[in-house]
Design a protein with these regions (language model features):
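Alpha-helical repeat scaffolds
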Residues: 1-19, 28-41, 63-81, 87-91, ...
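Cys/His-clustered metal-coordination modules, chiefly Zn-binding fingers
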Residues: 73-176
Length: 176
């Protein structure tokens, strides 16, 4: 990054992301202090980064208060066993659509797939679920796993989560 900085390239977000990784991997820092330090860093995806740490460390999500916009975390929260962040209308709509909350949202979600799941749930059709793919907004590459940095063009914070409606299956997807 120093070489790029000398050429007047914008490296602030990358340096913040690297700091977050260093803080997250510091074994001497208590978990709560890690989250507090990372939350103060300013890079796209900091909220998701903290949420990933909560999940990785098996911390209860009740202690998490910096939820990212649902567009940045829908794939993480989709399989949560219980509803979280219900004061946010988008989170509320998703958990209502999944049947994990009885609190019907007051307005439609801005994500079409969530609205479709809610309509199917209300109509008694419960055989739908969401699957996710990840696309870089800069180079348009599509990958199977989320990454904070595009694995093709290396752009930080450019991965978009795309939800698709698919059919629920009773199988676990393992080969014989």
């Amino acid at each position: 990054l120093d070489a790029l900085r000398e050429q007047d390239a914008e490296v602030y977000a990358q340096s913040q992301f690297e700091r977050a990784q260093i803080i997250a991997n510091d074994a001497n820092t208590p978990f709560n202090k890690k989250i507090a330090k990372i939350s103060k860093l300013n890079f796209k995806g900091a909220g998701r980064f903290c949420m990933e740490l909560f999940i990785k460390n098996k911390e209860p999500m009740e202690g998490f208060d910096r939820f990212p916009p649902i567009e940045q975390a829908i794939d993480l929260i989709y399989d949560f066993p219980a509803a979280v962040n219900m004061q946010d209308a988008e989170y509320n709509a998703l958990f209502y659509a999944l049947g994990k909350s009885d609190q019907k949202p007051g307005s439609a979600s801005k994500i079409f797939e969530i609205n479709a799941l809610m309509a199917m749930k209300d109509a008694g059709f419960g055989d739908a679920r969401l699957s996710f793919s990840y696309t870089c907004a800069k180079c348009k590459s599509s990958v199977g796993l989320f990454s904070h940095r595009c694995p093709v063009c290396y752009e930080l914070g450019s991965m978009e989560i795309r939800a698709q409606i698919s059919e629920k299956t009773g199988e676990i997807g393992q080969t014989f």
